[in-house]
Amino acid sequence: TTGMSVALSAHIELCQSCRQRSSELESREIVSWLQADRAQPLASPDFSGMLDLITSQPQLTSETKEAPHSEEEPLVSEIHMLDHSITLPRVLAKAASRGLVWHKLAGGINQAQVQIDNETQCEFLYMTPGSQVPVHRHQGSEVTLVLDGGFEDEFGHYGPSDFLVRDKRDQHQPSTEEGCLCFAVLDSPLTFTSGLARLFNPINNYRFRRATSQRF
Protein backbone atom coordinates (compact mmCIF):
# COMPACT_ATOMS: atom_id res chain seq x y z
CA THR A 1 0.00 0.00 0.00
CA THR A 2 1.02 3.64 -0.35
CA GLY A 3 1.04 4.10 3.42
CA MET A 4 3.48 1.25 3.99
CA SER A 5 5.65 2.47 1.11
CA VAL A 6 5.81 5.90 2.78
CA ALA A 7 6.94 4.30 6.06
CA LEU A 8 9.63 2.30 4.24
CA SER A 9 10.80 5.38 2.32
CA ALA A 10 11.09 7.32 5.59
CA HIS A 11 13.14 4.49 7.10
CA ILE A 12 15.49 4.46 4.11
CA GLU A 13 15.90 8.23 4.44
CA LEU A 14 16.94 7.85 8.10
CA CYS A 15 19.20 4.81 7.63
CA GLN A 16 22.49 5.36 5.75
CA SER A 17 23.21 1.69 5.08
CA CYS A 18 19.63 1.16 3.84
CA ARG A 19 19.94 4.12 1.47
CA GLN A 20 23.10 2.61 0.05
CA ARG A 21 21.49 -0.81 -0.30
CA SER A 22 18.39 0.69 -1.91
CA SER A 23 20.57 2.54 -4.41
CA GLU A 24 22.37 -0.70 -5.27
CA LEU A 25 19.06 -2.50 -5.83
CA GLU A 26 17.81 0.30 -8.07
CA SER A 27 21.04 0.18 -10.08
CA ARG A 28 20.68 -3.57 -10.54
CA GLU A 29 17.07 -3.12 -11.69
CA ILE A 30 18.16 -0.55 -14.27
CA VAL A 31 20.95 -2.78 -15.55
CA SER A 32 18.57 -5.73 -15.76
CA TRP A 33 16.09 -3.63 -17.70
CA LEU A 34 18.75 -2.44 -20.14
CA GLN A 35 19.99 -5.98 -20.70
CA ALA A 36 16.56 -7.59 -20.97
CA ASP A 37 14.87 -8.41 -24.24
CA ARG A 38 12.49 -5.50 -24.77
CA ALA A 39 9.92 -7.97 -26.06
CA GLN A 40 9.75 -9.69 -22.65
CA PRO A 41 7.78 -7.92 -19.89
CA LEU A 42 9.66 -7.35 -16.66
CA ALA A 43 8.48 -9.26 -13.59
CA SER A 44 6.82 -7.26 -10.83
CA PRO A 45 9.25 -6.21 -8.09
CA ASP A 46 9.26 -8.45 -5.04
CA PHE A 47 8.36 -5.77 -2.47
CA SER A 48 8.46 -8.13 0.52
CA GLY A 49 11.82 -9.56 -0.50
CA MET A 50 13.24 -6.10 -1.14
CA LEU A 51 11.95 -4.87 2.24
CA ASP A 52 13.57 -7.82 4.03
CA LEU A 53 16.84 -7.29 2.18
CA ILE A 54 16.98 -3.57 2.93
CA THR A 55 15.95 -3.72 6.58
CA SER A 56 18.26 -6.64 7.34
CA GLN A 57 21.31 -4.46 6.77
CA PRO A 58 23.21 -3.08 9.80
CA GLN A 59 22.18 0.47 10.55
CA LEU A 60 24.65 3.35 10.73
CA THR A 61 24.20 6.73 12.36
CA SER A 62 24.86 9.78 10.20
CA GLU A 63 23.64 13.28 9.54
CA THR A 64 22.36 14.24 6.10
CA LYS A 65 21.27 17.53 4.60
CA GLU A 66 17.88 17.67 2.98
CA ALA A 67 17.47 19.16 -0.48
CA PRO A 68 15.57 22.46 -0.52
CA HIS A 69 11.92 22.12 -1.41
CA SER A 70 9.68 24.27 -3.52
CA GLU A 71 7.94 27.20 -1.84
CA GLU A 72 4.76 25.94 -3.46
CA GLU A 73 4.89 22.84 -1.26
CA PRO A 74 5.03 23.95 2.41
CA LEU A 75 6.25 21.10 4.58
CA VAL A 76 5.81 20.42 8.28
CA SER A 77 9.50 19.74 8.86
CA GLU A 78 9.33 19.41 12.66
CA ILE A 79 7.04 18.06 15.36
CA HIS A 80 7.28 19.74 18.75
CA MET A 81 6.96 17.33 21.67
CA LEU A 82 7.33 18.53 25.26
CA ASP A 83 10.71 20.27 25.56
CA HIS A 84 12.24 19.39 22.19
CA SER A 85 11.53 19.21 18.46
CA ILE A 86 11.85 16.24 16.13
CA THR A 87 12.83 16.75 12.50
CA LEU A 88 10.73 14.62 10.16
CA PRO A 89 12.00 12.68 7.15
CA ARG A 90 11.00 14.53 3.99
CA VAL A 91 8.38 11.98 2.93
CA LEU A 92 6.67 12.25 6.34
CA ALA A 93 6.92 16.03 6.29
CA LYS A 94 4.92 15.92 3.08
CA ALA A 95 2.37 13.56 4.66
CA ALA A 96 1.98 15.91 7.63
CA SER A 97 1.70 19.06 5.52
CA ARG A 98 -2.11 19.02 5.76
CA GLY A 99 -1.79 19.58 9.49
CA LEU A 100 -1.68 17.33 12.54
CA VAL A 101 -4.48 17.17 15.09
CA TRP A 102 -3.39 15.35 18.24
CA HIS A 103 -5.79 13.30 20.33
CA LYS A 104 -5.05 11.95 23.80
CA LEU A 105 -5.73 8.25 24.17
CA ALA A 106 -5.65 6.14 27.32
CA GLY A 107 -2.41 5.43 29.15
CA GLY A 108 -0.37 8.45 28.05
CA ILE A 109 -0.64 7.71 24.32
CA ASN A 110 -1.18 10.57 21.86
CA GLN A 111 -2.25 10.01 18.26
CA ALA A 112 -2.45 12.16 15.11
CA GLN A 113 -3.78 10.54 11.94
CA VAL A 114 -2.64 11.46 8.44
CA GLN A 115 -4.45 10.51 5.25
CA ILE A 116 -2.19 8.78 2.72
CA ASP A 117 -4.39 6.15 1.07
CA ASN A 118 -7.79 4.53 1.62
CA GLU A 119 -6.44 1.11 2.52
CA THR A 120 -4.47 1.79 5.68
CA GLN A 121 -4.65 3.73 8.94
CA CYS A 122 -1.57 5.96 9.09
CA GLU A 123 -0.71 7.87 12.24
CA PHE A 124 1.93 9.52 14.35
CA LEU A 125 2.00 8.09 17.86
CA TYR A 126 3.65 9.78 20.82
CA MET A 127 4.12 7.73 23.98
CA THR A 128 4.82 9.92 26.99
CA PRO A 129 7.65 8.83 29.33
CA GLY A 130 6.60 5.89 31.47
CA SER A 131 3.59 4.99 29.34
CA GLN A 132 2.55 1.73 27.72
CA VAL A 133 0.05 0.46 25.16
CA PRO A 134 -2.34 -2.27 26.36
CA VAL A 135 -1.56 -5.84 25.31
CA HIS A 136 -2.87 -6.35 21.79
CA ARG A 137 -2.66 -8.47 18.67
CA HIS A 138 -3.11 -7.57 15.03
CA GLN A 139 -5.78 -8.68 12.60
CA GLY A 140 -3.38 -7.95 9.75
CA SER A 141 -0.04 -6.17 9.36
CA GLU A 142 1.40 -3.17 11.16
CA VAL A 143 4.62 -1.37 10.33
CA THR A 144 6.17 1.03 12.84
CA LEU A 145 9.04 3.46 12.32
CA VAL A 146 10.68 4.95 15.42
CA LEU A 147 11.39 8.66 14.87
CA ASP A 148 12.58 9.74 18.31
CA GLY A 149 13.20 8.15 21.70
CA GLY A 150 12.56 4.44 22.00
CA PHE A 151 10.25 1.71 23.24
CA GLU A 152 10.38 -1.96 24.02
CA ASP A 153 8.09 -4.97 23.85
CA GLU A 154 8.36 -8.72 24.32
CA PHE A 155 10.60 -8.97 21.26
CA GLY A 156 13.23 -6.31 21.98
CA HIS A 157 14.12 -2.62 22.31
CA TYR A 158 13.82 -0.18 19.43
CA GLY A 159 15.36 3.24 18.84
CA PRO A 160 15.44 5.98 16.20
CA SER A 161 15.16 4.75 12.56
CA ASP A 162 14.25 1.18 13.61
CA PHE A 163 11.59 -0.33 11.32
CA LEU A 164 9.29 -3.03 12.72
CA VAL A 165 6.76 -5.30 11.07
CA ARG A 166 4.11 -7.08 13.15
CA ASP A 167 1.34 -9.36 11.88
CA LYS A 168 -1.52 -11.53 13.15
CA ARG A 169 0.94 -14.01 14.68
CA ASP A 170 2.24 -11.40 17.13
CA GLN A 171 0.87 -10.21 20.46
CA HIS A 172 2.80 -7.57 22.37
CA GLN A 173 2.69 -4.65 24.80
CA PRO A 174 4.88 -1.69 23.79
CA SER A 175 6.14 0.47 26.66
CA THR A 176 8.60 3.33 27.05
CA GLU A 177 10.58 4.86 29.89
CA GLU A 178 12.06 7.76 27.93
CA GLY A 179 9.14 8.64 25.65
CA CYS A 180 8.83 7.76 21.98
CA LEU A 181 7.54 9.23 18.73
CA CYS A 182 6.62 6.72 16.02
CA PHE A 183 4.94 6.60 12.65
CA ALA A 184 2.66 3.58 12.29
CA VAL A 185 0.68 2.07 9.42
CA LEU A 186 -2.01 -0.59 9.89
CA ASP A 187 -3.91 -2.47 7.20
CA SER A 188 -6.49 -3.69 9.75
CA PRO A 189 -7.56 -2.73 13.29
CA LEU A 190 -5.57 -3.87 16.30
CA THR A 191 -7.35 -5.88 19.01
CA PHE A 192 -6.78 -5.41 22.75
CA THR A 193 -6.72 -8.80 24.46
CA SER A 194 -6.81 -8.21 28.21
CA GLY A 195 -8.62 -6.30 30.92
CA LEU A 196 -10.81 -3.28 30.45
CA ALA A 197 -8.86 -2.32 27.32
CA ARG A 198 -10.98 -4.83 25.39
CA LEU A 199 -13.89 -2.40 25.74
CA PHE A 200 -12.06 -0.11 23.30
CA ASN A 201 -12.02 -2.67 20.46
CA PRO A 202 -15.24 -1.34 18.87
CA ILE A 203 -13.63 2.13 18.91
CA ASN A 204 -10.51 0.73 17.22
CA ASN A 205 -12.68 -0.81 14.52
CA TYR A 206 -14.56 2.46 14.03
CA ARG A 207 -11.35 4.50 13.81
CA PHE A 208 -9.97 2.15 11.18
CA ARG A 209 -13.15 2.27 9.08
CA ARG A 210 -13.17 6.05 9.30
CA ALA A 211 -9.48 6.32 8.38
CA THR A 212 -9.93 4.13 5.30
CA SER A 213 -13.18 5.67 4.09
CA GLN A 214 -11.69 9.03 3.15
CA ARG A 215 -11.77 9.98 -0.51
CA PHE A 216 -8.96 11.62 -2.42
Per-range role (PLM):
Residues 10, 103, 189-216:
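Alpha-helical membrane-targeting segments
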Residues 170-192:
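Ligand-binding loop in jelly-roll beta-barrel domains
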Residues 153-176:
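Short acidic-glycine-tyrosine-enriched beta hairpin
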Residues 17, 132, 162-163:
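Residue-level marker of beta-strand positions
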Residues 128-131, 137-153:
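Glycine- and acidic-residue-biased ligand/ion/polar-headgroup-sensing regions
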